[in-house]
């Protein structure tokens, strides 16, 4: 949070000094630099508290596992980034208002799933600890708690979106988007947050269960499915709602596969 706040302050100063888009890049780079230094310092402090062990480590096997998991995560991130970029760039073929609205909606959507993404990251650690104790995740107390918390968050985000989406958008663009924000768009954005909560939770669960291959595959498959649906529907309905239909299809596919691969 501190690094983000510092980056925001630097960003404003760079814009004031006339750096423009360069200020954004500078602020982002500074934020990542500060975050990396901070995390490195904290990690070293934590490592000092861990007792040393004489346990023999199979370094070649560990190295192979590291690069294997890293490769799967890289492939997953690549397809997910490309799909989200497609949703942004496809809006650029619409009106200026729709371009701006799509950008705002995706930013709000990103803020929405931060809550469950935090749970997903925590679940990965908790599940790994559970598995290391030779206990099963399926039908465990941990599984029930994760699902119940995620369900509560997903309902909350969906309801808030339906009721106040136009108000959130007005915070950034006044009332010039009223023509484009109808009930259908509100429901689609709300549904994406509802389904997305489970999709991101299953990501953390699969990584905790050491199923990086499935974790990567379901994101690749869901991104491709969302892209195909968008491409097909946009031929006859070139609207923002169509883009969100594609995103919902992708998230639904991802959440269903994520649930299946847990078993």
Residue ranges of each PLM-predicted region?
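Short membrane-interface helical motifs at transmembrane helix boundaries
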Residues: 156-178
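Helix-terminus/linker motif at the lipid-water interface of multi-pass membrane proteins
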Residues: 15-19, 78-111, 129-130, 169-175
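Interhelical loop/hinge segments that connect adjacent transmembrane helices in multipass membrane
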Residues: 25-28, 39-81, 263
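Alpha-helical transmembrane segments of multi-pass membrane proteins
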Residues: 1, 108-110, 176-202, 228
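Single conserved hydrophobic/aromatic residue that forms the stacking wall/gate
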Residues: 1-11
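Small-residue-rich transmembrane alpha-helices that serve as helix-helix interface/gating elements
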Residues: 24-36, 221-224, 240-258
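Small-residue-rich hydrophobic transmembrane alpha-helices
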Residues: 102-163, 197-210, 214-215
């Amino acid at each position: 949070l501190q690094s983000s706040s510092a980056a925001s302050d630097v960003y404003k100063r760079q814009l004031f000094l006339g750096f423009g888009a360069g200020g954004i890049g500078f602020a982002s780079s500074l934020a990542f630099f500060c975050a990396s230094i901070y995390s490195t310092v904290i990690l070293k402090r934590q490592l000092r508290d861990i007792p040393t062990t004489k346990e023999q480590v199979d370094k070649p096997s560990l190295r192979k596992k590291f690069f294997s998991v890293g490769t799967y995560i890289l492939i997953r991130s690549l397809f997910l980034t490309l799909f989200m970029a497609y949703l942004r760039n496809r809006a650029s073929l619409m009106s200026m208002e729709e371009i701006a609205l799509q950008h705002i909606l995706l930013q709000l959507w990103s803020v929405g799933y931060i809550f469950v993404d935090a749970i997903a990251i925590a679940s990965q650690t908790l599940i790994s600890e559970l598995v290391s104790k030779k206990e099963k995740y399926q039908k465990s107390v941990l599984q029930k708690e994760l699902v119940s918390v995620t369900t509560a968050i997903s309902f909350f985000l969906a309801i808030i979106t339906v009721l106040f989406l136009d108000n959130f958008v007005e915070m950034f663009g006044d009332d010039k988007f009223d023509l484009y924000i109808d009930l259908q768009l509100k429901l689609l954005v709300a549904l994406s947050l509802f389904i997305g909560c489970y999709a991101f939770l299953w990501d953390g669960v699969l990584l905790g269960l050491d199923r990086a291959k499935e974790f990567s595959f379901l994101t690749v498959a869901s991104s491709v499915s969302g892209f195909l649906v968008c491409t097909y529907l946009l031929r006859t309905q070139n609207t923002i709602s169509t883009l969100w239909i594609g995103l919902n299809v992708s998230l639904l596919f991802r959440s269903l596969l994520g649930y299946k691969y847990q078993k």
